[in-house]
């Protein structure tokens, strides 16, 4: 059965993200002293008394501000409450009840949902009881004094919470594919995610950088589970101020690191930038499978049968780190070619996890040597390849045993890699070659195994 969901709501800077981190046992959500810093709703698994549930961290609620984001944040909170089994309303015990707290409480009372009031920042147990008592006036039942920083009081709160959650064991999750959606700000990452999953799950706004956190969404398609990680837009370092956005860039790189495959989203209306190149290099360095997604293709004017080919040529020229990745020309707005993304992801992951027998690898190496022997040095020393074998997957990694690795310069190493790709494919994934020096006797022992 699906895990029950608990929505965490409240006004800005009452400690919602710190509270969620406490429940989840990790420092994952961005915590920073800025109203509305958690713009999207983020899901974290939590456990209490052998019970598992998901905690949804929503943005700080404000009802009377002119900010462009605040209506979107309220909408995200509403969506979280619609799918929740219970809610936790976090308030600030040091500040006492505010007018905004009363507004939020009135809004929550209209919902047919159990609501617990967590009075945060109650660092003293004795004073906490006094501070919490003020919040009876919200009309939501007993307030629970807690300290998200120290963890005090959360046990009593959670004991009450699990009485509202359905009993039952959760089934083990099916194997899933982790997909990071990455790219510069405003290339359409969240719009792409929304189109793929069919709901306004992530905030979408024309203002650059509206998705600050790395958000997970799990869906099932064609019998396979996909965990989509929608990352914040990645800017040049000189354009990233200290604060939440800097943390989000770090989070985006973490999302790439924990993914199986990265959808690198590009804007068809803009040229490939230096930041696109740096991001492509990072994906390759991390050894992640990748699919290039050229978004907004519907907005490209005067297209003909040669337009895609011309763009693809420029794309691979600029992003030579990812010349092994397939490119899809799509529109999140119209849905053009979106159905091909799942197949491309599946194919890339299959190649990323692929293993080839040692006999096949050595057949490819011998064929490559037949057409192009390693060049000799000025002193007449000739490079020799004794043996090759695949030693790892994700990404596919091959050990090449040679007489002296220093004799094989970059050009010849690229030639061997290109021959492996030409003969064996591995489209959609980087491959790595480990050049290992071995004495002839050691090499003979390896071959004999």
Swiss-Prot record:
UniProt keyword annotation of Cell cycle present: no
HAMAP family: GTPase_Der
Assembly mode: Associates with the 50S ribosomal subunit.
Pfam family, one: MMR_HSR1
Record protein name field: GTPase Der
Domain EngA-type G: 4-169, 177-353
Keywords: GTP-binding, Nucleotide-binding, Repeat, Ribosome biogenesis
Function: GTPase that plays an essential role in the late steps of ribosome biogenesis.
GO molecular function: GTP binding; ribosome binding
């Amino acid at each position: 059965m699906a895990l029950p969901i608990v929505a965490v709501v409240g006004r800005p800077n009452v400690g919602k993200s710190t509270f969620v981190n406490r429940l989840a046992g990790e420092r994952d959500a961005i915590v920073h002293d800025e109203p509305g810093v958690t713009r999207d709703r983020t899901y974290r698994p939590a456990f209490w008394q052998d019970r598992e549930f998901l905690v949804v961290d929503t943005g700080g609620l404000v009802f009377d501000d002119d900010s462009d984001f605040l209506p979107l944040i309220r909408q995200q909170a509403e969506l979280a409450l619609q799918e929740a089994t219970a809610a936790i309303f976090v308030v600030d015990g040091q500040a006492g009840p505010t007018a905004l707290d009363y507004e939020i409480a009135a809004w929550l009372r209209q919902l047919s949902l159990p609501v617990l009031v967590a009075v945060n920042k109650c660092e003293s147990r004795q004073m906490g009881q006094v501070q919490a008592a003020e919040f009876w006036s919200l009309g939501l039942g007993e307030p629970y004094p807690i300290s998200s920083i120290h963890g005090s009081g959360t046990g009593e709160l959670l004991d009450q919470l699990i009485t509202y959650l359905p009993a039952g064991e959760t089934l083990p999750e099916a194997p899933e594919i982790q997909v990071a959606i990455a790219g510069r700000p405003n290339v359409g990452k969240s719009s792409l995610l929304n189109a793929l999953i069919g709901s306004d799950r992530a905030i979408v706004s024309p203002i650059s950088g509206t998705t600050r956190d790395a958000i997970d969404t799990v869906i099932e398609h064609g019998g396979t589970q996909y965990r989509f990680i929608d990352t914040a837009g990645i800017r040049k370092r000189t354009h990233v101020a200290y604060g939440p956005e800097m943390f989000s860039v770090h989070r985006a790189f973490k999302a790439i690191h924990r993914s199986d495959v990265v959808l690198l989203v590009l804007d068809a209306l803009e040229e490939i930038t230096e930041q696109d190149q740096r991001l492509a290099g990072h994906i390759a360095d991390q050894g992640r499978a990748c699919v290039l997604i050229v978004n907004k293709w519907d907005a490209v004017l005067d297209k003909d049968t040669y337009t895609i080919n011309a763009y693809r040529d420029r794309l691979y020229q600029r992003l030579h780190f990812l010349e092994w990745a397939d490119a899809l020309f799509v529109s999140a707005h119209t849905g053009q070619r979106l159905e091909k993304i799942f197949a491309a992801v599946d194919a890339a992951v299959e190649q990323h996890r692929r293993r080839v027998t040692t006999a096949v690898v050595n057949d490819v190496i011998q064929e490559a040597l037949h057409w192009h022997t390693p060049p000799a040095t000025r002193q007449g020393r000739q490079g020799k390849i004794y043996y090759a074998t695949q030693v790892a997957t994700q990404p596919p990694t091959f050990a090449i045993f040679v007489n002296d690795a220093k004799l094989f310069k970059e050009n010849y190493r690229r030639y061997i890699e290109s021959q492996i790709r030409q003969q064996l494919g591995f489209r959609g994934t980087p491959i790595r070659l480990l050049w290992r020096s071995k004495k002839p006797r050691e090499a003979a022992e390896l071959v004999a195994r």
